[in-house]
Amino acid sequence: MKTMKKYIKTAFFCSMYWLIVQLNIANLGTRIPDKYFRQKYIIFKSFNFEKHGKFWNKWFYVRKWKHKILDGHQLNQNIYDQRHLMTINTDEIEKMIIETKRAELIHWISILPVIIFNKGPRLVKYINIFYAMIANVPIIIVQRYNRPRLTQLLRILKRKGERHD
């Protein structure tokens, strides 16, 4: 009984830790000015093996499950709400590309706090590593899948000269 109580207490504190840390990372991430995401950093580059996002769908079937991921705007009002996308124009697509970069960065950073569990008991460490991966990697994959497709759409719109609707 004492061991069970200890596990429940540990689970509670780990849950609170992740909730507080991830909400704070997301909140700080939304404060990064857009200008930093307009630059071409290598981390956001679509690599050759990704084949403009096709890799992610071929190996992870992204199209089948990406719509099931909770929209970050529901937890943090500062996160871009893509449901308000009324028109498809270059300004909106550029904003969506910026937000895919922001989301990817936030979720990469959100994995790092798992380091705190490095010295903890093996079970606690493995559960928290699993949680950090399962909570963040799917969102990173979706961003890496969507961004090249949005970039291609932006190129097409710019070629057609559609600046505003």
UniProtKB/Swiss-Prot annotation:
Annotated GO MF terms: acyltransferase activity
Membrane topology, from the record: Single-pass membrane protein
E.C. no: 2.3.1.-
Keywords, ordered alphabetically: Acyltransferase, Carotenoid biosynthesis, Cell membrane, Membrane, Signal, Transferase, Transmembrane, Transmembrane helix
Keyword Nucleus found: no
Location of this chain's protein in the cell: Cell membrane
Enzyme class: transferase
Chain ranges passing through the membrane: 126-145
GO cellular component terms given for this protein: plasma membrane
Primary location class: membrane
InterPro entries for the chain: CrtO
Signal peptide: 1-28
The keyword Cell membrane appears for this protein: yes
Domain of life: Bacteria
GO biological process: carotenoid biosynthetic process
Pathway: Carotenoid biosynthesis; staphyloxanthin biosynthesis; staphyloxanthin from farnesyl diphosphate: step 5/5
Family to which the UniProt record says this protein belongs: Belongs to the acyltransferase CrtO family.
Function: Catalyzes the acylation of glycosyl-4,4'-diaponeurosporenoate, i.e. the esterification of glucose at the C6'' position with the carboxyl group of the C(15) fatty acid 12-methyltetradecanoic acid, to yield staphyloxanthin. This is the last step in the biosynthesis of this orange pigment, present in most staphylococci strains.
Name of the protein in question: Glycosyl-4,4'-diaponeurosporenoate acyltransferase
